[in-house]
Swiss-Prot record:
Protein location: Golgi apparatus membrane
EC number(s) per entry: 2.3.1.225, 2.3.1.-
GO molecular function: protein homodimerization activity; protein-cysteine S-myristoyltransferase activity; protein-cysteine S-palmitoyltransferase activity; protein-cysteine S-stearoyltransferase activity; S-acyltransferase activity
Free-text description of this protein's post-translational modifications in UniProt: Autopalmitoylated.
Name of the protein described by the UniProt record: Palmitoyltransferase ZDHHC3-A
Function according to Swiss-Prot or TrEMBL: Golgi-localized palmitoyltransferase that catalyzes the addition of palmitate onto various protein substrates and regulates their association with membranes. Has no stringent fatty acid selectivity and in addition to palmitate can also transfer onto target proteins myristate from tetradecanoyl-CoA and stearate from octadecanoyl-CoA.
Annotated Pfam families: DHHC (PF01529)
Subunit field text: Monomer. Homooligomers. The monomeric form has a higher catalytic activity. Forms heterooligomers with zdhhc7.
Cellular compartments per GO CC: endoplasmic reticulum; Golgi apparatus; Golgi membrane
Highest classification ranks of the organism: Eukaryota, Metazoa, Chordata, Craniata, Vertebrata
Swiss-Prot/TrEMBL domain comment: The DHHC domain is required for palmitoyltransferase activity.
PANTHER family in UniProt: PALMITOYLTRANSFERASE ZDHHC16
Gene Ontology biological-process annotations: peptidyl-L-cysteine S-palmitoylation; protein localization to plasma membrane; protein palmitoylation; protein targeting to membrane; regulation of G protein-coupled receptor signaling pathway
Organism per entry: Danio rerio
Amino acid sequence: MRSPVPRFRDVERQASGLQPPQCLPSCHERQSSMWFIKDACGIVCAIITWFLVFFAEFVVLFVMLIPSKNLTYSLVNGTLFNSLAFLALASHFRAMCTDPGAVPKGNATKEYIESLQLKPGQVVYKCPKCCSIKPDRAHHCSVCKRCIRKMDHHCPWVNNCVGENNQKYFVLFTMYICLISLHSLVMVVFHFLNCFEDDWTKCSTFSPPATVILLILLCFEGLLFLIFTSVMFGTQVHSICTDETGIEKLKREDPTWEKTQCWEGMKSAFGGPLSVTWFSPFTDLSCQKDDSSPVPMFPQGEIIEEDVIEIPLEPH
């Protein structure tokens, strides 16, 4: 359903705790504390994700590479696969434990709204669940129980929302999982071909039936995750390039913001111009300094009751 009243997009760049337009996600806000969602389903899904990666590691190393007679083949593929798997798990951890862009709770006060210096006739929205002023493009997540800036969706596999501050890590996670899935499938095919040409008893330290079962399981896992993560990766890149989140597409919201170009959106999501840091889950998003006067993140005052606040027009 389309929004009947256009939201006020300037709140996002004027409210403290919400970055100005030229500033990427706040550095001190992201690093101040560990972010973790205590959701049973999400925790189980995250554990399953790590288990499946370690299972793939086990099959690749102990079933295919270590028993191989070709040392160069084992070293090259072992180094490549383990490096990609490590980057995938690191990206998963960052996506899971990074604040996706939560709006501070309880800032829907009269004093706070006055400090924003809004223009007459402008409209701001209060989230009745968070008691906070919702910036444009922020949506409330029922699992995280917070309003998230530029929320794309809540992903149980990373036990977190994918939002403004952690979209980079989610994109990297899907990319690296896609790559190790493809790599494992290629190695399984080569291993099967070598085993058919050679003696199965010399092909692996495991028995032939156990080897076949493990390879089939890895093949099934690799194919499943290759399809899933490649679709998710493409969806996320398309979302960044079109400057429209998944939830905005789902709700068919009319854009009240000025859309950015594809390359500018990529630079914003990944923290600057194209460089090797784009592919690293260990680098934080850079933040430019804002010269505007600061506004208190947690202003004092009573929470207003209205969910839609319109700044009154000046009397003539």
